[in-house]
A protein has these predicted regions:
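Active-site cores that bind ATP or allylic diphosphates and position pyrophosphate for catalysis
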Residues: 107, 111-267, 274, 288, ...
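Glycine- and acidic
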Residues: 7-13, 40-45, 216-221, 284-289, ...
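Residue-level signal for inorganic ion chemistry
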Residues: 28, 59, 99, 103, ...
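C-terminal accessory/binding modules appended to enzymatic or scaffolding proteins
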Residues: 418-479
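N-terminal Rossmann-like or analogous alpha/beta NTP/dinucleotide-binding catalytic cores
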Residues: 1-128, 229-240, 301
Length: 506
């Protein structure tokens, strides 16, 4: 049974992939791998009016960066292809025709003006116009339920524009099961007759989705909560075709950090965080939207963070490798209620992953930043720097702020720290310290610390009177790694030069 698990991620190429979409892909991927199943990418491009040319490649690039590759999809193991719905449109017409022949669908020739008039007429009476059993065979509606077969054929032959609607059954209580939300019951009398095939010759999402899921042998439909209202129609379509219905699981929304509602790009722009996995450039406006990759997030930390937006393992553990997530993931642990996004938590995850990264990997990421600043140092030196600062970093982009003093002397000194720590007598102490440092032969961190502290002890003064001005001289502020590690790294001559510079300026 487990090897028959087949799930799909089916985004529409209408723009960049939102992190909510990435989470849907991730949950599908985790579920598939947990059950030794297949993860499929299908591009649902039936809405040609909203199609964006570079969106499909963006989706594929995003999944690749997130390390959640698809097993089947465009250009890969196309056993059930093609995997773009626009390349399957002839197929859908056959299935729409089948529904008409079996009485589950009908032709509608109403123009948009006709429908607007019906809506306004109903609104004038304080009613909502719903195209369903209540009025589809009454009044002035023009469809194959009120026209004769000859009249319908005449209209089709004349090239009249038509849509095909699903004929929702009347007076039926539909009982459904969702893997996350449990039992769902709905009265079919409350449903409208959705369009299955549009006037432009393309199917709607509903028909194409069901046909493709059946033909691609999808066993579980794991998708966002926004599709929950479509579940009754989709279940009825399976019934109409006499096909086995897959199991459904509707994921909770990702909510904005502040206030109520679904997380949007506007929230990210307002609060200063990305909502897309990769940077995205709008080809029309040339507007650039930030991406988690370009903002310095590690893909594995990003995925770990996303996994907890709606799911938890039932333990206190928060840090998981991808393999760990696969082993722990279970739909029964997915929440029904929305998950509030936290930019701070996203940063926290990145910081946790920073500590687990191999220093060599971090050096490779930091070296281009140094190169842009015109700094060239051997790899072993940068490796030592990274090992000293990474515990204080959230992003690799933080490295320069945390380590610039290893590469260049400070050009200014923190005013508040200078006022507090460079007092009367400090210049004399620092001048004497230069002599002490000059006479140190073993300039290792341990030995330098030992000799300078012995000198301070012998002078019977507080350590702070020397250590704080010394750190200020070398770093420019009262921050940074262990002071004597800095001294050992920059060397004797540079240490002396910086103290002399501080004496001169302070």
């Amino acid at each position: 049974m487990e090897s028959n698990v087949r799930v799909r991620f089916a985004p529409s190429p209408t723009g960049p992939l939102h992190i909510g979409g990435v989470r849907t892909a991730l949950y599908n991927y985790l579920f598939a791998k947990k059950h030794n199943g297949t993860f499929i990418l299908r591009i649902e491009d039936t809405d040609q009016t909203r199609y964006v040319a570079n969106a499909e490649q963006y989706i594929i690039d995003a999944l690749e960066w997130c390390n959640i590759p698809f097993d089947e999809g465009p250009g890969k193991n196309e056993k059930f292809g093609p995997y773009r719905q626009s390349e399957r449109k002839e197929l859908y017409k056959e299935y729409a025709d089948t529904l008409i022949k079996t009485g589950w669908a009908y032709y509608c020739f109403d123009s948009s003006e006709d429908l607007d008039a019906h809506r306004k007429g109903h609104e004038a009476e304080g009613k909502n116009f719903i195209y369903n059993w209540h009025n589809r065979e009454k009044g002035r509606l023009i469809n194959s339920l009120v026209l004769t077969t000859e009249e319908v054929q005449t209209k089709i032959n004349a090239g009249d524009t038509y849509v095909i609607r699903f004929k929702t059954p009347q007076d039926e209580i539909l009982r459904m099961e969702d893997e996350i939300r449990g039992k769902i019951t709905i009265d079919t009398n409350t449903l409208d007759d959705k369009i299955l095939f549009k006037g432009d010759g393309m199917p709607t999402y509903h028909l194409a989705n069901i046909v493709d899921d059946h033909l691609m042998e999808i066993s579980h439909v794991i998708r966002g909560e926004e599709w929950l209202p479509s579940m009754p129609l989709h279940v009825l379509l399976y019934k109409a075709f006499n096909w086995t219905t897959p199991k459904f699981a509707h994921l909770p929304l990702i909510l904005k950090p502040v206030g109520k509602g679904k997380l949007s790009k506007r929230d990210g722009d307002k609060l200063g965080f990305p909502v897309f996995p990769l940077e995205y450039t709008n080809e029309e406006t040339k507007d650039v939207s930030r991406g988690y990759k370009e903002d310095g997030y590690f893909s594995d930390g990003f995925i770990n963070m996303l996994s907890f937006l709606g799911w938890n393992p039932g333990t206190e553990q928060e840090i998981f490798t991808l393999e760990g997530l696969i082993a722990a993931f279970d739909l029964s642990r997915v929440s029904k209620s929305g998950a509030k996004f936290s930019p701070d938590k996203a940063s926290w995850f990145n910081q946790q992953y920073m500590q687990t990264k191999d220093n060599t990997e971090l050096v490779n990421l930091y070296t281009p930043i140094l190169r842009e600043k015109g700094i060239s140092k051997d790899k072993s030196f940068i490796l030592k720097v990274v090992s000293l600062i990474k515990e204080r970093a959230v992003f690799v982009n933080d490295f320069w702020e945390l380590s610039n003093f290893f590469f260049e002397a400070p050009i200014s000194f923190d005013a508040k720290a200078s006022k507090k720590n460079w007092k009367e007598g400090t210049t004399e102490l620092m001048t004497e310290l230069i002599s002490v440092i000059t006479n140190i032969n073993d300039f290792s961190s341990e030995n330098t610390e030992k000799e300078i502290k012995e000198w301070i002890t012998n002078k019977e003064i507080g350590f702070g009177k020397v250590m704080q001005p010394l750190r200020l001289s070398l770093v420019g502020k009262l921050a940074g790694p262990h002071l004597f590690d800095i001294i050992a790294m920059i060397g004797k001559q540079e240490t002396i030069r910086r103290i002399e510079n501080a004496i001169d300026k302070l």
